[in-house]
Regions:
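Short amphipathic alpha-helical interface segments
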Residues: 424-441
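A short, conserved structural fragment
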Residues: 465-474
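The alpha-helix within a helix-turn-helix
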Residues: 447
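Short, cationic-aromatic polyanion-contact patches
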Residues: 421-427, 475-485
Length: 485
C-alpha cells in the first residue's frame, strides 16, 4: 500500500493511476479497472493530480461519498462492467493534508474471471497495463485469457483429426520402461500400448467412437511435424551460451528433424546437458554410490515445471539457456496463481495437468504445489544466489532464473565454464515490491529491506535499469531508484 504521508514522492506507473475526478467519475476509470484486473493489479487514486515533474499531489474531492456511491452502482452494472472483483474494503476515503481522496485497490483477477472488460464487448473493452498506461489487448491475448479461464486443463482435449499411430513408438517404449523402474509391478505394466495410453490420459475415445491422442499425448509422445499441426507456435529450444563471441556453443531444437521433437524426449536431452556440470560429492548407500543431489532434484523440478506450465499456443516457444552464470527457463503463458502463493507452496494450478500426471508417474515433478518452494529451499541451503522469476506481457511469458554463483563468490555447488561471478540474480521481486510501495529508494534502503549487501543490490539495480524496469536519478550516494513510469 502507498505511504500517503509521502504521496508527492510517487509517480504513475504500471501499478498506480491517478484521476482528478472533479465532480464526477472519469470514464477512463473503467479502462484502468480492466487493465489492472487483467494484469498485476494496482491502485487508482481519485482526487489526485500529476504535476509537470510527474510527482503526485492531492487536490481533494468535494463529495467523495457520492463518487464512491456512483462507483459501486456502475461497477455492479453488467452492461458496463462484466464482473466486479472488488470487496467493500478495496474502496475507501483517505485524508491527506486536510484533503479527501478516494482509494480504489484493484486486485489481479483470478484466471476464472478473465477477461475483465467494459461496455459489454470483450473485443473492444478488454485492457491490460504496461509501463506506458492502459492498452487494448490484441486478439492473441484475448484468446489466451479465455483458454486460461476454462476449468478443464488445456491438454485433456481429444484430437480427432489424428490417431495414435502418429505417436513416436520409441518415446512410448522409453516412457514405459522408466515407469516400470519407478513403479515395478504397476497394474498397467501388461496393457497394450493403446490401452496404456488411454489409462495415462495420452489418448481417449472421440465422438466417432475411435481412439485418438489427447493434446497431452501428442505433446508428450508425438513428432514435431504433427505437433505443430495442432500447436502452430510449438517450439522447444535449448542453448548453451558460454562464449560471448559466438551465438551459442551447443543447441537442441524441436524442429531440427533428427529426433522426435516432443516434450518427453526434450526433457531428458536437456536434463542430461544441465546436470553434466553439477558437482557430486562422494556418498555411499550400502555399497552403491549415490550420484543424485538436492541440486539435481531442483533442476529436474524446474525443468518439469517449465514444460508442464507452458502455454503451447503461445508465441516464442519454450526456451532453456545455460550460461556460466545461470540456468534460464522460459515458457509462454501467464502465472495462473499469485507468485507469492506459488513460492509459499501448498496450492497448485498447472496449465497442463495431464502432462504433470505423466511426469509424476516416472517420479519427475512435485504435486500439491511444493515444487517451487523446494527449488528456493535447495538453492538457499547450497548458499547460491536466490532464484527469481521475471514476468512479461505482449506476449505473456514467465522466466525462471537459477543463478549458479554465491554472494561471496566462493566455490559453487555447480561449476560451469570459467569462474566469473554472476550479478544478474537476487531478490528481484522484493526490490520491485519495495519500489512499488515506496515510490523511490536508495540502494542502502533496498539492501536493508532485502538483507543483501548494498554492493550486491546495486548490481541487481543495474540489471533492472538495463532491462528497463527501473530508472535511476542522481549520482553516487544520492542516487535514487524508481519503477519506470
Amino acid at each position: 500500500m502507498i505511504d500517503f504521508s509521502n504521496l508527492e514522492s510517487y509517480t504513475e506507473n504500471n501499478r498506480i493511476e491517478v484521476k482528478k475526478a472533479q465532480g464526477t467519475l472519469p470514464n477512463s476509470i473503467w479502462e484502468t479497472y480492466s487493465s489492472f484486473a487483467n494484469t498485476l493489479g494496482g491502485i487508482i487514486l481519485l482526487g489526485v493530480a500529476e504535476t509537470k515533474n510527474k510527482s503526485l499531489v492531492p487536490i481533494g474531492l468535494s463529495d467523495p461519498e457520492k463518487l464512491i456511491k456512483d462507483f459501486w452502482y456502475i461497477i455492479n452494472n453488467q452492461n458496463k462492467i462484466n464482473i466486479n472483483i472488488l470487496t467493500s474494503s478495496d474502496v475507501f476515503i483517505q485524508e491527506i493534508n486536510g484533503k479527501s481522496i478516494v482509494v480504489i485497490n484493484v486486485p489481479r483477477a483470478q484466471r476464472f474471471y478473465k477477461p475483465v472488460y467494459i461496455n459489454g464487448n470483450p473485443v473492444s473493452g478488454t485492457y491490460r497495463r504496461n509501463g506506458e498506461g492502459d492498452y487494448h489487448v490484441n486478439n492473441e491475448e484475448l484468446k489466451e485469457m479465455y483458454r486460461e479461464a476454462n476449468v478443464k486443463a488445456q491438454d485433456i482435449m481429444i484430437i480427432e483429426a489424428m490417431d495414435t499411430s502418429l505417436l513416436c513408438s520409441d518415446s512410448i517404449n522409453s516412457y514405459r520402461q522408466r515407469m516400470k523402474l519407478s513403479r515395478p509391478g504397476h497394474i498397467w505394466e501388461g496393457l497394450s500400448d493403446e490401452v496404456f495410453l488411454m489409462k495415462l490420459g495420452a489418448a481417449g475415445i472421440g465422438a466417432d467412437g475411435k481412439i485418438h491422442p489427447t493434446a497431452a499425448g501428442l505433446l508428450m509422445f508425438g513428432y514435431e511435424s504433427d505437433i505443430v499441426r495442432k500447436f502452430p507456435n510449438y517450439f522447444l529450444d535449448y542453448r548453451e551460451d558460454y562464449d560471448n563471441s559466438t551465438r551459442w556453443t551447443d543447441r537442441i531444437q524441436s524442429s531440427s528433424g533428427d529426433w522426435s521433437g516432443n516434450v518427453y524426449d526434450f526433457y531428458f536431452r536437456v536434463y542430461n546437458k544441465l546436470q553434466q556440470d553439477i558437482k557430486v560429492p562422494f556418498k555411499l548407500e550400502g555399497n552403491m554410490r549415490i550420484d543424485d543431489t538436492p541440486v539435481h532434484m531442483a533442476i529436474r523440478e524446474a525443468l518439469a515445471n517449465c514444460i508442464i506450465n507452458a502455454d503451447y499456443y503461445g508465441r516464442q516457444g519454450l526456451v532453456v539457456i545455460k550460461t556460466k552464470d545461470s540456468i534460464l527457463l522460459s515458457n509462454p503463458g501467464d502465472f495462473r496463481i499469485e507468485l507469492d502463493a506459488a513460492k509459499s507452496g501448498g496450492y497448485s494450478d498447472p496449465r497442463n495437468s495431464t502432462l504433470m500426471k505423466m511426469f509424476n508417474l516416472i517420479d519427475i515433478g512435485e504435486r500439491a504445489g511444493s515444487g517451487i518452494p523446494s527449488i528456493y529451499y535447495i538453492w538457499e541451503k547450497q548458499g547460491l544466489n536466490e532464484p527469481y522469476f521475471r514476468q512479461s506481457f505482449e506476449p505473456n511469458r514467465i522466466t525462471l532464473v537459477l543463478p549458479i554463483t554465491k554472494d561471496d563468490d566462493k566455490k559453487s555447488a555447480i561449476k560451469i565454464g570459467d569462474k566469473k561471478s554472476a550479478i544478474k540474480s537476487a531478490k528481484i521481486d522484493r526490490i520491485i515490491e519495495y519500489l512499488t510501495d515506496h515510490a523511490e529508494a536508495k540502494a542502502s534502503e533496498l539492501a536493508e529491506y532485502s538483507g543483501l549487501k548494498a554492493s550486491r543490490v546495486r548490481d541487481y539495480l543495474k540489471f533492472l535499469v538495463e532491462e528497463g524496469t527501473v530508472t535511476a536519478e542522481g549520482s553516487n550516494r544520492n542516487r535514487i531508484y524508481k519503477l519506470k513510469s
